[in-house]
Amino acid sequence: MNQKIWELFEARKILLKDIKALNTSEFSTKKTLDIFWGVDNKSFYNLVFLRTAKSRLLRKEALELEEISKKIETKFQTSLRKKTIFYSSEICSKALKELQDNNWRCYDFV
């Protein structure tokens, strides 16, 4: 993984052991999305999305992220406790509310 991702994780105090970068093409056709999967200190499974698109994140895409996380849960037969998204663009207020209502942690980065 590159240095920028480690800096994002360190800034938000996300510490995952056995972290893996998942192949995004298995779950989505989005080229601006990176998916990381790992286990935290309390043995909970975490899913981290890194979105580097320049366009605004809309509610439709927030629903797609939820579908992708469900696909990952069924593929690995686990229950994801923490879902996080890092995004570099603006986010629609309805998309942010949708994600937060589904227990997502949302962080922007520049």
Name these PLM-found stretches:
Residues 1-36:
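Acidic-basic catalytic patches of nuclease active cores, encompassing PD-(D/E)XK
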Residues 2-5, 48, 52, 78, ...:
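A near-ubiquitous, low-amplitude feature marking generic local secondary-structure context
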Residues 15, 25-29, 62-66, 84-85:
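A short linear-motif detector with a strong N-terminal bias
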Residues 28, 34-72:
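Conserved catalytic cores of phosphodiester-cleaving nucleases, focusing on short active-site segments
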Residues 78-110:
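Short, compact, well-ordered microdomains
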